[in-house]
């Protein structure tokens, strides 16, 4: 039975494996990147777990072209990033130890960005 399960999961792994289409190297200061969002022809990311309150904008070569500092808030544990036509949303709701009660989603006006 174990052999059948092993063969089954090996087959699924091969069947659903993905090929890397595009790969780039980010600077070392983005070693805790936790989110990615397409924005204005570039990509936005952020650092996790108490990093600086900065959204990093980089191109498809991995070159950081802008650092958008968010001065009004602290990065407790930023985890997620999304955008629409008017706002960028940052999910500050990392809570690995279940000890935070200040979980929030930041709403940043693109006009102020």
Language model regions located:
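Hydrophobic h-region of N-terminal signal peptides that target proteins for export
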Residues: 5-17
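Surface loop/turn motifs at the tips and blade-to-blade linkers of beta-strand repeat domains
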Residues: 24-29, 69-73
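Beta-rich catalytic cores
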Residues: 32, 75-77
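Short coil/turn segments that connect the beta-strands within blades of beta-propeller domains
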Residues: 40-41, 85-86
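Beta-propeller domains
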Residues: 44-69
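Short, solvent-exposed loop/turn segments at conserved positions within beta-propeller repeat blades
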Residues: 48-52, 97-102
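Beta-propeller blade signature
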Residues: 57-60, 102-112
């Amino acid at each position: 039975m174990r052999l059948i399960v092993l063969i089954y999961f090996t087959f699924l792994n091969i069947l659903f494996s993905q090929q890397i289409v595009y790969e780039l190297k980010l600077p070392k200061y983005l070693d805790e990147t936790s989110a990615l969002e397409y924005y204005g022809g570039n990509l936005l990311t952020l650092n996790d777990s108490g990093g600086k309150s900065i959204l990093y904008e980089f191109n498809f070569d991995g070159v950081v072209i802008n650092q958008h500092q968010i001065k009004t808030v602290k990065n407790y544990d930023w985890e997620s990033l999304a955008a629409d036509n008017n706002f960028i949303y940052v999910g500050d709701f990392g809570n690995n130890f279940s000890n935070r009660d200040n979980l929030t989603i930041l709403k940043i006006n693109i006009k102020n960005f």
